[in-house]
Amino acid sequence: MAPAASGAKKQKKKWSKGKVKDKAQHAVILDKSTSDKLYKDVQSYRLVTVATLVDRLKINGSLARRCLKDLEEKGQIKQVVGHSKMKIYTRAIGADE
């Protein structure tokens, strides 16, 4: 019984307060400057996903998905992986087609 009692004297772990992440204020509507940046810069990206557009252009996820669909219809990007949760695109190169 003595060894069990000595184990209880261990100091309790103090919990940290945790970090609070600021809420992102990303654009919900595609304005002219963001649209120009999208069409110009996306040709240099090797990997294009919703997350890359959200991170680089500061737009929200639903807008990024619509942009990807539009870029694919215009032939600027092509789909590499189509999954129910994530679609991965790459830049379309004329020699591939």
Swiss-Prot record:
Q: What is its main location?
A: cytoplasm
Q: Where is the signal peptide?
A: none
Query: Which cellular components does GO assign to this protein?
Result: cytosolic small ribosomal subunit
Where do the segments described as Disordered lie? 1-24
Which Pfam families would you find in this protein's record? Ribosomal_S25
Q: Which InterPro entries match?
A: Ribosomal_eS25, WH_DNA-bd_sf
What are the alphabetically sorted keywords of the record? Answer: Cytoplasm, Ribonucleoprotein, Ribosomal protein
What interactions and quaternary structure are annotated?
Component of the small ribosomal subunit (SSU). Mature N.crassa ribosomes consist of a small (40S) and a large (60S) subunit. The 40S small subunit contains 1 molecule of ribosomal RNA (18S rRNA) and at least 32 different proteins. The large 60S subunit contains 3 rRNA molecules (26S, 5.8S and 5S rRNA) and at least 42 different proteins.
What job does this protein perform? Component of the ribosome, a large ribonucleoprotein complex responsible for the synthesis of proteins in the cell. The small ribosomal subunit (SSU) binds messenger RNAs (mRNAs) and translates the encoded message by selecting cognate aminoacyl-transfer RNA (tRNA) molecules. The large subunit (LSU) contains the ribosomal catalytic site termed the peptidyl transferase center (PTC), which catalyzes the formation of peptide bonds, thereby polymerizing the amino acids delivered by tRNAs into a polypeptide chain.
The Swiss-Prot or TrEMBL record describes its family as follows: Belongs to the eukaryotic ribosomal protein eS25 family.
Protein name per its UniProtKB record: Small ribosomal subunit protein eS25
